[in-house]
A protein has these predicted regions:
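Active-site-proximal beta-strand elements of phosphoester/diester hydrolases
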Residues: 3-11, 118-124, 188-190
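Active-site environment of divalent metal-dependent phosphoester hydrolases
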Residues: 11-15, 40-42, 66-69, 127-128, ...
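Divalent metal-coordination and catalytic microenvironments
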Residues: 9, 37, 52, 62-63, ...
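Residue-level marker for buried hydrophobic side chains located in beta-strands
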Residues: 6, 34, 59-60, 119, ...
C-alpha cells in the first residue's frame, strides 16, 4: 500500500523540511503532499519550491502563497514590490508558474482499505458543503465556525471548524498554527508553527502516525 506523507506549513523553512522528510524515511514510491504556505516569512522560499518540484511532491495553495502570487503579478507597480521584494527577486518565472498551478484542494483516494477518502486543503471547509462547492476564501483562510456554524477566518478557540467536520472526507489541513496539532476523527491539522520557532509536522497515512522536527530558530512573529 502506498504511503502518503502530508507536511504542514513550511513557510520557506527548507532545512526543517529536509530533516522532517529524513525522519519520515521517505523513499521512492511514497507520496509527499504539502498543505500549503510553501513560501513567505521563512529563510528560503525558493529552496522549498525547488525541493517540492524536484521531488515531484504535490501541494495545495496556501493563503500566503496566494498573496505572494498577487504581489508578483503586480510586480511592476512600485508599491507592490516593497513588502515582498526579497521574495520577488528570489523566485524565478518557473517557480511562480508552479505556485500559480497549485489547486485549492486535492483528493488523495481512500485512507487504506475501507477507509474514508482523504482530502488536503490549506485552511478548512464548511461542514455540509462539498469541496467543489466551498468558497475559495474558506479553503484558504477558514479557522472557526462562530456558534458552530458561521464561517470565520478569526481565531475563536472555542469553535474550530475541524471539530464540527463530519466528513465524508478525512481532511488534512494547515494554516492554524496557534491551535497547533489538531486530531479529530475526520480532520487533522498539521500546522505547528515551524516558522514561529516551534515544530514542523507531518502526518503519515494510512497509519495516522505523526512526525515532528523542531525549528532551528524563530524566523517570524505570529
Amino acid at each position: 500500500m502506498q504511503r502518503t506523507i502530508v507536511v504542514g506549513d513550511v513557510h520557506g523553512c527548507v532545512d526543517e523540511m529536509q530533516a522532517l522528510l529524513r525522519q519520515c524515511g521517505v523513499v521512492r514510491g511514497d507520496r509527499v503532499v504539502l498543505a500549503g504556505d510553501l513560501v513567505a516569512k521563512g529563510p528560503d522560499s525558493r529552496g522549498v519550491v525547488q525541493l517540492v518540484r524536484e521531488m515531484g511532491a504535490l501541494a495545495v495553495l496556501g493563503n500566503h502563497d496566494d498573496f505572494c502570487i498577487d504581489v508578483w503579478r503586480r510586480r511592476h507597480q512600485a508599491e507592490a514590490r516593497r513588502p515582498r521584494r526579497w521574495l520577488l527577486d528570489t523566485l524565478d518565472e518557473s517557480d511562480w508558474a508552479f505556485l500559480e498551478s497549485l489547486p485549492l484542494f486535492l483528493r488523495l483516494g481512500a485512507e487504506g482499505e475501507g477507509g474514508p477518502e482523504v482530502a488536503v486543503v490549506h485552511a478548512g471547509a464548511v461542514p455540509g458543503v462539498p469541496l467543489e462547492e466551498q468558497e475559495r476564501d474558506n479553503l484558504l483562510s477558514l479557522r472557526s465556525l462562530v456558534g458552530g456554524s458561521a464561517p470565520s477566518r478569526r481565531l475563536l478557540m472555542r469553535w474550530p471548524w475541524a471539530a464540527a467536520w463530519r466528513g465524508p472526507e478525512h481532511i488534512v489541513f494547515g494554516h492554524d498554527a496557534v491551535r497547533g496539532l489538531q486530531q479529530y476523527p475526520l480532520a487533522t491539522g498539521v500546522d505547528t508553527g515551524c516558522v514561529y520557532g516551534r515544530e514542523l509536522t507531518a502526518l503519515e497515512l494510512p497509519s495516522r502516525r505523526i512526525y515532528k522536527v523542531p525549528a532551528r530558530r524563530r524566523y517570524a512573529g505570529v
